[in-house]
Amino acid sequence: MENGIKESQVGLNKNGTHAILPSPVVSEGHKNHKSILNSLMSGALAGAVAKTAVAPLDRTKIIFQVSSNRFSAKEAYRLIYRTYLNEGFLSLWRGNSATMVRVIPYAAIQFCAHEQYKKLLGSYYGFQGSALTPIPRLLAGALAGTTATIITYPLDLVRARMAVTPKEMYSNIIHVFMRMSREEGLKSLYRGFTPTVLGVIPYAGISFFTYETLKKLHAEHSGRTQPYPFERLLFGACAGLFGQSASYPLDVVRRRMQTAGVTGHAYGSIIGTMQEIVAEEGVIRGLYKGLSMNWVKGPVAVGISFTTFDLTQILLKKLQRLSDIQR
């Protein structure tokens, strides 16, 4: 009883024959604990798989974002190829270890928080057990992204630093933290935090909203409660496309502020950074630099992420049911 599960017991009927009492019943507290754990595990795996798949494109995008060089698909290809020739194939994943250190807790927290915010908002608005209406659906995604960002932000800054510097400058993640703290102060670990949060709110809100809405519409029109994996990939790709397009200028601003210590610029505020970028490079070429690459990278990453999360959740729930039955 203490573990939240009632075990099946064998009793005797009045006529002396054996009778099996009710099957195991899992308490609400135990079910919620399992749900949170499953969400954390599924989210962690989803983030790791998605980010590793697009790491070379992500690194290339960051390098262009923090420089004044004009972006084009041709120049991006040249950069990737030149990096491969000079530093080797695995160098295309430079900084990915820092990415994993950040993205695994980030994705775990974000997906888990999203599930919990959906329940909380569903209870508050009276939609418990059914799909949320559009505004709570958007709010659940925005809150989930904000929660994860607040907790894991310094790891994102470290990833950006490692992506744009030669490997001789920083040997590992701990070295980045120590050197930044010593040379630039502890406050530098949260440089660019404000534009990051302001960008995450529309990005996470729109991404989760789009994905959940497409799944809801699919269920209504197809009669199937669960989409096929390729349909999940497509829904996730649309979610990534819309979410990243809406928040991209703030993504450029945060990268400039995060890497100011190694690029020679002194970006101090969001407005000041935007003004300097626009003055030097223009609106489209500056604030939307690398967006075309994000239209390739983003939908792929988000599609893989949402699909991996959903399928892992389904698998873990099936395994949990089997485990409960065997008890």
Swiss-Prot record:
Protein's UniProt keywords contain Membrane: yes
Gene Ontology BP terms: ADP transport; AMP transport; ATP transport; coenzyme A transmembrane transport
Solcar repeats: 34-120, 132-217, 227-315
Cysteine disulfide links: none
Keywords of this entry: Membrane, Mitochondrion, Mitochondrion inner membrane, Repeat, Transmembrane, Transmembrane helix, Transport
Superkingdom per UniProt: Eukaryota
Record field: transmembrane: 36-56, 92-112, 138-158, 189-209, 233-253, 296-316
Protein name, per record: Mitochondrial coenzyme A transporter SLC25A42
Catalytic activity: ADP(out) + CoA(in) = ADP(in) + CoA(out); 3'-dephospho-CoA(in) + ADP(out) = 3'-dephospho-CoA(out) + ADP(in); adenosine 3',5'-bisphosphate(in) + ADP(out) = adenosine 3',5'-bisphosphate(out) + ADP(in); AMP(in) + ADP(out) = AMP(out) + ADP(in)
GO molecular function, one term: AMP transmembrane transporter activity
Gene: slc25a42
